[in-house]
Amino acid sequence: MAAKVEPFWKRKTLAQLDQDEWESLCDGCGLCCLQKLEDEDDGSVYYTRIACKLLDLQTCRCTNYAERIRFVPDCIQLTPAQADEFQWLPPTCGYRLVAEGRDLPLWHHLVCGDPEQVHKERISQSGRMLSESQVAEDDWEDYLIFRAG
């Protein structure tokens, strides 16, 4: 009987992941592509339902991932070197969970094998977002959905 091999996210640090492993940690929820507002008084970060103009509002995937920085210069590119800053990410985020030494949830595609499960479980905001091109920036605070952290 062959020994059971632990999944890569349990036996490697973020810095040890190859590019494919790193990219596969993304569960496709799209939450990191939502516009966020910071409270000037206490520094709290709040997520809105307002999505980046490149985010597909149904699939929660970037419509131009390869060239996203060209079209959205302030797009956040997550890297292993930033792991100590991941607390602004949703508590369900694979990058944040692995950085914190925790396991991926049962609905994560690497665990269950179904990339649609993130939508079926309503972890993503699929179908509940608005494009930033539809809402004036001054009105974003009307669309807060949760506080990060």
Swiss-Prot record:
NCBIfam families, per the entry: PRK05170.1-5 (NF003501), PRK05170.1-6 (NF003502), PRK05170.2-5 (NF003507)
Annotated protein name in UniProt: UPF0260 protein PSPA7_4092
Phylogenetic classification of the source organism: Bacteria, Pseudomonadati, Pseudomonadota, Gammaproteobacteria, Pseudomonadales
Pfam families recorded: CxxCxxCC
PANTHER family, sorted: UPF0260 PROTEIN YCGN (PTHR37421:SF1)
InterPro entries per the UniProt record, alphabetical: Puta_zinc/iron-chelating_dom, UCP006173
Record field: transmembrane: none
Superkingdom, natural source: Bacteria
Family statement drawn from the similarity comment of this UniProt entry: Belongs to the UPF0260 family.
